[in-house]
């Protein structure tokens, strides 16, 4: 019996895979629990269309990430912070501050996607790595200046 998996099943296959199983396993376990559907002609067409739409959506997300990375690459960002006599800032520059500064420039980036190479606790130039997509990462150079 052929079934189409609705989710990943260890040892059997991944979501939307067409797999051959014994009739008892398919009818008594996989289908009643919602792990799979019977592989009819119409179900195969629906799954093929879903896969096509998912691929199109993933491609669009990647294109958007590339466009955003091009905007960020040529950007000069300044972050204002209170600085003491020794040049150290009070506290540290956070990903939220970087995200807010990018938003003021018209670029929306989730703060969770911004990572620093160490703590940013002094004035001067620094870099942050922004993970826009699993295949698109961009390095942002920013300057911390005294308020």
Swiss-Prot record:
Signal peptide: none annotated. Disulfide bonds: none annotated. Pfam families: Ribosomal_L9_C, Ribosomal_L9_N. Keywords: Ribonucleoprotein, Ribosomal protein, RNA-binding, rRNA-binding. InterPro entries: Ribosomal_bL9 (IPR000244), Ribosomal_bL9/RNase_H1_N (IPR009027), Ribosomal_bL9_bac/chp (IPR020594), Ribosomal_bL9_C (IPR020069), Ribosomal_bL9_C_sf (IPR036791), Ribosomal_bL9_N (IPR020070), Ribosomal_bL9_N_sf (IPR036935). It comes from the Bacteria. This is Large ribosomal subunit protein bL9. It comes from Cytophaga hutchinsonii (strain ATCC 33406 / DSM 1761 / CIP 103989 / NBRC 15051 / NCIMB 9469 / D465). The gene is rplI.
